[in-house]
Amino acid sequence: MHGYFGCNAAAEPGYSAFLGTPQICVTKMSTRNCQGMDSVIKPLDTIPEDKKVRVQRTQSTFDPFEKPANQVKRVHSENNACINFKTSSTGKESPKVRRHSSPSSPTSPKFGKADSYEKLEKLGEGSYATVYKGKSKVNGKLVALKVIRLQEEEGTPFTAIREASLLKGLKHANIVLLHDIIHTKETLTLVFEYVHTDLCQYMDKHPGGLHPDNVKLFLFQLLRGLSYIHQRYILHRDLKPQNLLISDTGELKLADFGLARAKSVPSHTYSNEVVTLWYRPPDVLLGSTEYSTCLDMWGVGCIFVEMIQGVAAFPGMKDIQDQLERIFLVLGTPNEDTWPGVHSLPHFKPERFTLYSSKNLRQAWNKLSYVNHAEDLASKLLQCSPKNRLSAQAALSHEYFSDLPPRLWELTDMSSIFTIPNVRLQPEAGESMRAFGKNNSYGKSLSNSKH
């Protein structure tokens, strides 16, 4: 259940974040690639002082149920999620997350209360959180309880505040749902919908590459979720198979928003210590701290190839240098002609890299040639120059998806793709339909179900 907590999600030293609704005018963006995406972000020095709100990892007087006092400043968003900043007696601002419990009798279990959930089993442990499978005493549903340990000296982990603040405002079938937030003196608990596995575990269970139809449905759902958050100017920043949850019916859900960032916030540079090395784009590996949604799209390309080929696209074994060499071996060593501006990146030293020519992707990953249009889509996602990468919205319109039912593009945000007739997963190699049980939606091939 790595997707619920993310072992590498500890906050970077000295890291600050800005939360809230964009206070800027957004221009129309290209739907073909990531070029021009950064133009919608105002530099920090152009934002009036009274519009700047900073959250730091400080000792917290965190109480999600306290009514706002007069000294509380509110940062609103269009979806009514908000983060409050209450000025303490020391003059520092400490983060507060507000939520409202539904009315109930004094003796019945309530949302927002620790005794409303029963822990069933431990699922895993990260650097600052432990995840349990649990059950709600309010409605009887299974949940995942992400229990974050609060350190008296450090206060509430910043990544937890970021994750909660973003997820409370995201409602989409392909994004893990945050049901509840519980705060006690010792812990902060995020209560998520329970999803039984992740893409990493799913691929480990089915080595050698997944069924092509299933790859297509998983990728479509990943792009749906990303398109939704990117349209809201949010970057995930930590895409990897462990952070993509898979339900027993085949629904894919983006999870672990601990490193996610609202890109509409007035900040041009972000930490480059994000994204597991295998899924980290070359611009970030080379020290770039100015990036946008194209950061996530590189990860999509890596995951796409891995689902088809059955092995990681760029499995670096040593360090950043080794990771870059593996990328350049396939895509070619960049220069100013193929990647304008690459020489200005902090860690790009041409003499350090072997000079490789680019090759067709099927030479590196032969199974791409077995699937119509897969190589073309992968090549448009795995572009060294970030501005050349396809956007999530454009990728959804790629010919690779042309044999899917048109109604998939008409679904509302909260509607699952499996509500469309004949859209269902296929048994993976060596599995029978019986192995999945009666609740799973396996059936005839997608190639025969366009409508």
From Swiss-Prot:
Residues 117-401 form the Protein kinase domain. GO terms for cellular component: cytoplasmic cyclin-dependent protein kinase holoenzyme complex; cytosol; nucleus; plasma membrane. It is an enzyme of class 2 (transferase). It comes from the Eukaryota. Found in a complex with LRP6, CCNY and CAPRIN2 during G2/M stage; CAPRIN2 functions as a scaffold for the complex by binding to CCNY via its N terminus and to CDK14 via its C terminus. Interacts with CCNY; CCNY mediates its recruitment to the plasma membrane and promotes phosphorylation of LRP6. Interacts with CCDN3 and CDKN1A. Interacts with SEPT8. Interacts with 14-3-3 proteina YWHAB, YWHAE, YWHAH and YWHAQ. Its EC number is 2.7.11.22. It comes from Plecturocebus moloch. The gene is CDK14. The active site is at D238 (proton acceptor). Transmembrane segments: none annotated. ATP binds at L123, G124, E125, G126, S127, Y128, A129, T130, V131, K146. The keyword Cell cycle applies. This is Cyclin-dependent kinase 14. GO terms for biological process: cell division; G2/M transition of mitotic cell cycle; regulation of canonical Wnt signaling pathway; Wnt signaling pathway. It is a peripheral membrane protein. InterPro entries: CDK (IPR050108), Kinase-like_dom_sf (IPR011009), Prot_kinase_dom (IPR000719), Protein_kinase_ATP_BS (IPR017441), Ser/Thr_kinase_AS (IPR008271). One of its GO terms (molecular function) is protein serine kinase activity. Keywords: ATP-binding, Cell cycle, Cell division, Cell membrane, Cytoplasm, Kinase, Membrane, Nucleotide-binding, Nucleus, Phosphoprotein, Serine/threonine-protein kinase, Transferase, Wnt signaling pathway.
